[in-house]
Amino acid sequence: MANVKLFNQGCQEIGTVDLAPEVFEVEVQPELLHLVVRAQLAAKRAGTHSVKTRAFVSGGGKKPWRQKGTGRARAGSTRSPLWRGGAVVHGPQPRDYTFKVNRKVRQLALRMALSAKLVEDQLVLLDAIAFPEVKTKLMAKVVSDFSWKKALIVLPESDNNLELSARNLPGIKVVRQDMLNVYDVLLHDHVVMMKDAALKVQERLGHGIR
């Protein structure tokens, strides 16, 4: 069992939590993490880039000058790719960059990412963070107390006060546990999980492992 310290939002240690080794103590395979991150970033691409070929550039129907006798090079159209304002050859066209990664592979990669954070002592467990109102100053104090520079805060469920309080803090991102992904985990220096969120992630990622 992975024994992890549990803190309150005042940065005081209040106990420990045992986390399942099949989720938080998995051997890390960098090539698998790389594959899943590539898939995530590829899925974000719009793929709307487009250039005009000779079929779509306006004009250029008339031969600019006769074939022989002018002393100039032969030209059949002012929209040739050789000309300024002409068409583009083999340029980018709209396309879909997404590629499939199996669900079990994505889940394994997430377990690896969380395991890496635990090994590097960058996984923080909090009992809870609760604010009576939306106040950036309250969240800024928590961040300052823990000395977080770039942190991913994982909640068991949506918390409007906390999410809005953290929205303007640079380097701080708040997500629900069901939206946790490999790219966000690796991108941030610290992964801060509420205890209930960690247990839900453990249940979800540990289900069906043999």
Swiss-Prot record:
User: Gene3D superfamilies, per this entry?
Assistant: 3.40.1370.10
- Molecular functions (GO terms): rRNA binding; structural constituent of ribosome
The Gene Ontology biological process terms listed for this entry are: translation
Region (Disordered) residue spans: 56-80
Question: Which keywords are on file for this protein?
Answer: Ribonucleoprotein, Ribosomal protein, RNA-binding, rRNA-binding
Keyword check for Ribonucleoprotein, yes or no: yes
**GO cellular component terms, A-Z:** ribonucleoprotein complex; ribosome
> What domain of life does the UniProt record list for this protein's source?
Bacteria
Q: Which InterPro entries match?
A: Ribosomal_uL4, Ribosomal_uL4-like, Ribosomal_uL4_dom_sf
Return the similarity comment.
Belongs to the universal ribosomal protein uL4 family.
Per the entry, what this protein does is:
One of the primary rRNA binding proteins, this protein initially binds near the 5'-end of the 23S rRNA. It is important during the early stages of 50S assembly. It makes multiple contacts with different domains of the 23S rRNA in the assembled 50S subunit and ribosome.
Task: Give the multimer and partner information.
Answer: Part of the 50S ribosomal subunit.
Official protein name in the record: Large ribosomal subunit protein uL4
Q: Which gene encodes it?
A: rplD
